[in-house]
């Protein structure tokens, strides 16, 4: 990837302000990125007399702005195009050395898909004891790899580096910690960028729709392989917080303690909307090519923009007020439509850094799995029925069990911008507002009534707002759980929003360590 870094360093300089004198504008030639033409004109502006004639196409009132941010994207596309023709598909997704579990046993997925075989990438820290009862399964967020902490084989710092190790949150003197790259990912586990063994071509968007529960079932295949009958604890943050709860619901007899940080028991409209927007931006990139881009230019522009949207949801407004305020990157220059304010340059950097580090299709599939997440009993029963029907088709010899057809369903009437008179207070209020969790969710979390559960939320989190963690705790209490612990970090403790679980070793790490001990 080093040539791309060179491109980033040689980006065109932002549009510079032109010195002006009263009643006269002298404009130099300005390159227009869209058509590469130059305009060279000088024209007098009179304060009195007859009205000036309308500018002709060759004599514009002002020069066109330059767009170095678009130039950079075009340059990157050109470089990737040349590279893909000369050295095969780009990029290669990897997080470094990891172990790999391969299962030859087919995996039936919740929505009817079938993986004839699959791999799960994983890494471990600490020592597995003789009874194999000191295992902590660490679940990741959406785009993380199995590399949660550095290892001898891969010394690069992991995404939870400060939380894992001797005497730390996940104490490797006591516990054997396992972290996997989720099913559907691109860091060693089977996903859209994996070759389909049926035809030798990459799955791309032929990969079946996934659920969080599918990911957990694949993880437990790994545990079976390692001879781990029961986990000491299931720990996760963000999407990992979903997985941690799902592990307990799916395998209540195989999970001890449960930790869910900045997660939820079911996805809610705001979070779904933000992930949908990211997917739409990505899919509108022409290079996405309906998912079949592996032998050509990856949709780096769509990925960049999707990551920028995601970054807005990962942090908090109050933090950015303190960190960036209204500062511009260079106040001496004329405002530009490309990144100009410090916050814009921050988002631009976040998107640029990510756009070739992660597979676009993995982002689509895994984010959709998050949207589909619902531990309510109704959804669990519907899924059980779907799986039974799919299994019956497989047993009868039907080859295709996955219905890949879909339709764009739009409302017959325009949406109302205000709640209708028929909307009940129960429909409008969350569990945290009413003090009563939905009966369906209470029934769905009943398998966890005898588990020790720690739920942590962050007041400044806008992606998984703190009321969603309160909903988990209140639901568990109503389901009969008498030991659930709920901690909410206020704005006086953390302004880092959803990313707090990655940064706050003292409050997040301290609470988890105390709970595990």
From Swiss-Prot:
The active site is at 238 (nucleophile), 461, 498. Transmembrane segments: none annotated. Residues 34-66, 413-436 are annotated as: Disordered. Its EC number is 2.3.1.-. One of its GO terms (cellular component) is mitochondrion. Its main location: mitochondrion. Residues 134-386 form the AB hydrolase-1 domain. Substrate binds at residues 307, 499. It is an enzyme of class 2 (transferase). It is found in: Mitochondrion. The keyword Metal-binding does not apply. Pfam families: Abhydrolase_1. Keywords: Acyltransferase, Amino-acid biosynthesis, Cysteine biosynthesis, Mitochondrion, Transferase, Transit peptide. HAMAP family: MetX_acyltransf. Belongs to the AB hydrolase superfamily. MetX family. Transfers a succinyl group from succinyl-CoA to L-serine, forming succinyl-L-serine. Also has weak serine acetyl transferase activity and homoserine succinyl transferase activity. This is Serine O-succinyltransferase.
